[in-house]
């Protein structure tokens, strides 16, 4: 990674730590970021959506999107890029949660969040549901920065991969629906 990018990424994280972090927000973001462990929050919501006819398609498409995101981020990109977690390379940065995977690029939590949100924005019946999905995904990405376990570029890359996987899952759904004669 170029030194100028490390300085920019690290500087932003140190600013967050010094200016934004506080005793009121810390527990919230620690809790919220851990809801994203293994995609738990997004998988649970997707499975819940499968139970209702009006949201069944959204649940199915988001599960496909998250599976694609998992393959892209955690199976391929993290090992291919091998970027070290920020608290290990940014002097003075303290992580608020423990992460056992030493690779940070791209953010898997953010990828899962935006993969689900992207799928939901294409399939949920109400505008407010789509807005909530986007806000929840953005909060997940921000939480990864707030707790100090990802660089901003990790989160941006996770968001991009997640959006792509949501779009790809939607295309897969449309093909499958056309082939099976289901409503797309």
Language-model features: where?
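Hydrophobic, aromatic-rich transmembrane alpha-helices
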Residues: 42-53, 113-121
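N-terminal transmembrane-helix/juxtamembrane module of multi-pass inner/ER membrane proteins
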Residues: 1-40, 74-102, 183-184
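Membrane-embedded catalytic cores of phosphoryl/pyrophosphoryl-handling enzymes
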Residues: 94-184
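Small-polar-interrupted transmembrane alpha-helices in polytopic inner-membrane proteins
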Residues: 64-80, 131-143
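Membrane-helix interface segments
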Residues: 24, 54-59, 125-131
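Membrane-water interface at transmembrane helix exits
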Residues: 49, 73, 77-82, 121, ...
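Alpha-helical transmembrane segments in multi-pass membrane proteins
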Residues: 61, 65-70, 74, 158, ...
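Interfacial segments of alpha-helical transmembrane regions
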Residues: 45-71
